[in-house]
Amino acid sequence: MAHKILVVDDEADIVELLRYNLELDGHELFSAGSGVEALNQARKHLPDVILLDLMLPDMDGFSICEILRCQPSTANIPVIMLTAMAGEMPRLHGFEVGASDYCLKPIRTRDLRERVRSVIETCAAREAAVNAELVNAVSVDQRKS
């Protein structure tokens, strides 16, 4: 099943590498090269996953992730942060602001494709559990009536 993925990176080579590899998996890709463009694209397309570079020309990925988490329409979209910044602190800060996962550059495409697949499956399972709980709640209410 095709999923919509927003790739946010100001390096065209990285965007094209990700586009090629993720389209092999049948995904539909959109891209943005700045923070403002990323926020606009996220609101417009409501992607299933956002791949977000931390270092963009107008704002950092941490700030973008925080903004996404504060808006009802984008609050639950999984974000995988992409960065060359190794170390525990940037990774932990990413999780603090709401990132779902973290991938170091240079990007190993097979690894990233698996991370995307995993995040999508986790979201689908969570949504199925919520739907099952709602159906169960409705059934209980109907039995009480």
Predicted regions and their residues:
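CheY-like receiver
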Residues: 122-145
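Active-site beta3 strand of CheY-like receiver
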Residues: 45-51, 56
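Active-site residues of response regulator receiver
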Residues: 9, 53, 83
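C-terminal output helix
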Residues: 106-116
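Short hydrophobic/Thr-rich beta-strand motif most characteristic of the beta2 strand and flanking loop
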Residues: 26-33, 41
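Charged docking surfaces used in two-component/phosphorelay signaling
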Residues: 16-24
